[in-house]
Regions:
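C-terminal membrane-associated helical module and adjoining short loops/tails
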Residues: 1-13, 20-23, 39-48, 118-188
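Helix-adjacent hinge/juxtasegments
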Residues: 66-117
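Membrane-interface helix caps of multi-pass small-molecule transporters
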Residues: 56-60, 113, 176
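Membrane-embedded alpha-helical segments that form the functional core of polytopic membrane enzymes
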Residues: 16, 21-66, 82-98, 152-165
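Active-site His/Glu-centered metal-binding helix of metallohydrolases
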Residues: 21, 49-57, 73, 77, ...
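Membrane-embedded alpha-helical bundles of polytopic integral membrane proteins
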Residues: 5-9, 17, 99-102, 106
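Core segments of transmembrane alpha-helices
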Residues: 18-26, 72-85, 107, 130-141
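Short helix-capping/hinge motifs at transmembrane helix termini and TM-loop junctions
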Residues: 30-34, 88-90, 103, 115, ...
Length: 188
């Protein structure tokens, strides 16, 4: 059953809100060593799975304006919060995480400005792949079976950085096209 575009109380939004609420707990259970933690890994897995489930529900029942705002926010809080927690625990290096965070801020501001003009910019396939690699690098760093394999999750982290920069460049390139279209339509 389709939901109204302005609906707030949807299953997808409830799952997204749950991800936002559980994110700080996730950060608290991240260990301060590089041996991983089954509790942290399990919670990370569930929270990442919830991202897929709320997306599936939104596609099945229709997206809402609140979900279009809350879902990317929950993703950024969860991923960047976990990454910065891992930086604070001396597991991740600050530089790649700072690059990813900088890209997220720039693109989020851009998408918000464009949205204020009535234009919705969906996530690109490259951006979705970036999110996947961000989730994987954190997951492997927390998973006790792979936590000591720094080469594996550092490679994934740097792949996420490259994907962040490429998708960020795509958004900025598309912004030129969008700006021209808005100007031609008299909206800009």
């Amino acid at each position: 059953m389709a939901v109204a575009p302005n609906a707030l109380a949807t299953w997808a939004n409830a799952i997204t809100a749950g991800r936002l609420v559980l994110s700080p707990i996730m950060f608290l259970v991240i260990p301060d060593h590089t041996r991983g933690s089954w509790i942290a890994f399990g919670l990370w897995f569930l929270l990442c799975l919830s991202d897929g489930i709320d997306g599936w529900l939104a596609r099945k029942h229709g997206t809402t304006s609140s979900g279009a705002f809350l879902d990317p926010l929950a993703d950024k809080v969860l991923v960047l919060g976990a990454m910065f927690t891992l930086v604070a625990r001396d597991v991740f290096w600050l530089v790649p995480v700072a690059i990813i965070a900088g890209r997220e801020v720039v693109i989020s501001v851009y998408r918000t400005l464009v949205a204020s003009k009535g234009v919705s910019i969906p996530a690109s396939q490259t951006a979705k792949l970036k999110t996947l690699f961000q989730q994987l690098c954190v997951g492997f760093a927390l998973w006790p079976w792979f936590a000591d394999d720094r080469a594996l999750w550092n490679t994934m982290l740097w792949i996420a950085v490259v994907l962040a920069l490429v998708s960020g460049a795509q958004y900025l390139w598309w912004s030129r096209i969008t700006s021209r279209a808005l100007a031609d339509a008299g909206v800009a």
